[in-house]
UniProtKB/Swiss-Prot annotation:
Predominant location category: cytoplasm
One Gene Ontology molecular-function label: RNA binding
Gene: smpB
Chain coiled-coil ranges: none
Protein name: SsrA-binding protein
Region annotation Disordered: where it falls in the sequence: 133-157
Keyword Translocase: no
Organism: Francisella philomiragia subsp. philomiragia (strain ATCC 25017 / CCUG 19701 / FSC 153 / O#319-036)
One GO cellular component, as annotated: cytosol
Length: 157
C-alpha cells in the first residue's frame, strides 16, 4: 500500500481572487514546506484569503498564506503561521511572471492549493485588477446564468 494519502481534492481556494481580479494565465508551482506545515495542511488548516505572490531576487514567494499549526505537530519547533514560503517554478515561468508584474495593473495571486500525489501544489495566476463596474457586471452575468438555468429546468419538467 502507498505510504502517502493520495487525494486529488483541493485543500484551499482563494475565492476572493476570482472576485477582485481578471485571471489571465495560470501556473502550477511547488511549495517549500516544513513537516509541521504538511501535517497542518493535511488537517485542512489553511487560509489563502489575502495571499499574494512576490518575486524577489529571481525567486517566487507566497506571502500571507496562513497555515495554522497543530498543537500536537509543532512541539519542538517555533511555528510561524504566516511565514513567507518559497514557490518552485521554472526560470522561464518566473521571467514571464516578472515581466507582466512590472507592467502597471498586473499582479500575481494564488488561486488554490491542492495535492498532486504526495506533494502540495499551488495554482497561481497572472491577474489584472477589476474595476467596481466590472465586478457589478460579473455579478449580473452570474445572476442571469443562474436564472436562465432555473428557467430551462422548469421548462423541461
Amino acid at each position: 500500500m502507498s505510504k502517502h494519502k493520495v487525494s486529488p481534492a483541493t485543500i484551499a481556494r482563494n475565492k476572493r481572487a476570482f472576485h477582485d481580479y481578471t485571471i489571465l494565465e495560470k501556473f502550477e508551482a511547488g511549495i517549500v514546506l516544513q513537516g509541521w506545515e504538511v501535517k497542518s495542511i493535511r488537517a485542512g488548516k489553511v487560509q489563502m484569503i489575502d495571499s499574494h505572490v512576490h518575486i524577489k531576487r529571481g525567486e517566487a514567494w507566497l506571502f500571507n498564506c496562513l497555515i495554522t499549526p497543530l498543537l500536537s505537530a509543532s512541539t519542538h519547533v517555533v511555528a510561524d503561521a504566516s511565514a513567507n514560503r518559497k514557490l518552485l517554478l521554472n526560470r522561464r515561468e518566473i521571467d514571464k511572471i516578472m515581466g507582466r508584474i512590472e507592467q502597471k495593473g498586473f499582479t500575481c495571486v494564488p488561486l488554490a492549493m491542492y495535492w498532486k500525489g504526495p506533494r502540495v501544489k499551488v495554482e497561481i495566476a497572472l491577474a489584472q485588477g477589476k474595476k467596481v463596474h466590472d465586478k457589478r457586471q460579473a455579478q449580473k452575468d452570474k445572476d442571469w446564468a443562474r436564472e436562465k438555468d432555473r428557467i430551462f429546468k422548469k421548462a423541461h419538467r
